[in-house]
Swiss-Prot record:
Listed Gene3D superfamilies: Phosphoglycerate mutase-like
Organism the protein comes from: Escherichia coli (strain K12)
Site annotation Transition state stabilizer: residues: H184
Family named by the database record: Belongs to the phosphoglycerate mutase family. BPG-dependent PGAM subfamily.
Protein name from the UniProt record: 2,3-bisphosphoglycerate-dependent phosphoglycerate mutase
Gene (name only): gpmA
NCBIfam families assigned to the protein according to its UniProt record, in alphabetical order: pgm_1, PRK14115.1
Function: Catalyzes the interconversion of 2-phosphoglycerate and 3-phosphoglycerate.
Extra information: Has a 10-fold higher specific activity than BPG-independent phosphoglycerate mutase. Inhibition by vanadate is a diagnostic test for discrimination between the cofactor-dependent (GpmA) and -independent (GpmI) phosphoglycerate mutases.
HAMAP family: PGAM_GpmA (MF_01039)
Length: 250
């Protein structure tokens, strides 16, 4: 049976991950640790014999720079790349820039967990005159006002990620090309929920660690057979637990 593989990588630790702040569409770069995580992901993929024909990422530099570092370690810096806002992190609305633990102290752990992980729960909206509104950013100049979020739930993130998967990424895989996607915790959770047909309760508890390759294997009909992380299982579990704990009051 022919097996097709897809590799997903959540960007390495960003400066705002390090500071435990809600990031969303804010364009913050990788921390030094994040660069190291991205390079380590590339080295691991190389050791495991992976190479690719095409790459996808978001229009946010923490994902773009993660992909650069991964491809550099693979000696595939030349690889064609498509960047799309549809792979951006979920938009966190008026929470963007706020410290997660301080927000939990103010509103309670459960409210922040729902804002972070609730399927249809949206954080408080931005206003259009807020400097954080994406309509002020030239990279989104071609988007309609309807496409520009003031906030997003995971459900709304799915509404943009999955059509992009079905219309753009999957056809390329079906043509025989080997694909890697470097994106974000919630855009990747959106894809995992769809591919694995997860319930809203199951996806609530899924935390994707930074800078760890996540491999999907598909059958000849492009139905997922299994998914697994590359690397040390204990280290990966610890990183995922750390992601889960970010939204708790100290």
């Amino acid at each position: 049976m022919a097996v097709t593989k897809l590799v997903l990588v959540r960007h390495g630790e960003s400066q705002w991950n390090k500071e435990n702040r809600f990031t969303g569409w804010y364009d913050v770069d990788l921390s030094e640790k994040g660069v190291s995580e991205a390079k380590a992901a590339g080295k691991l993929l190389k050791e495991e014999g992976y190479s690719f024909d095409f790459a996808y990422t978001s229009v946010l530099k923490r994902a773009i720079h993660t992909l650069w570092n991964v491809l550099d370690e693979l000696d595939q810096a030349w690889l064609p790349v498509e960047k799309s806002w549809k792979l951006n992190e979920r938009h966190y609305g008026a929470l963007q820039g706020l410290n997660k633990a301080e927000t939990a102290e103010k509103y309670g752990d459960e409210q922040v967990k729902q804002w972070r992980r609730g399927f249809a729960v949206t954080p408080p909206e931005l206003t259009k005159d807020d400097e954080r509104y994406p309509g002020h950013d030239p990279r989104y100049a071609k988007l309609s006002e309807k496409e520009l979020p003031l906030t997003e739930s995971l459900a709304l993130t799915i509404d943009r990620v999955i059509p992009y998967w079905n219309e753009t990424i999957l056809p390329r895989m079906k043509s025989g090309e080997r694909v890697i996607i470097a994106a974000h915790g919630n855009s990747l959770r959106a894809l995992v929920k769809y591919l694995d047909n997860m319930s809203e309760e199951e996806i609530l508890e899924l935390n994707i660690p930074t800078g760890v390759p996540l491999v999907y294997e598909f059958d000849e009909n492009f139905k997922p057979l299994k998914r697994y992380y590359l690397g040390n299982a204990d280290e990966i579990a610890a990183k995922a637990a750390a992601v889960a704990n970010q939204g708790k009051a100290k």
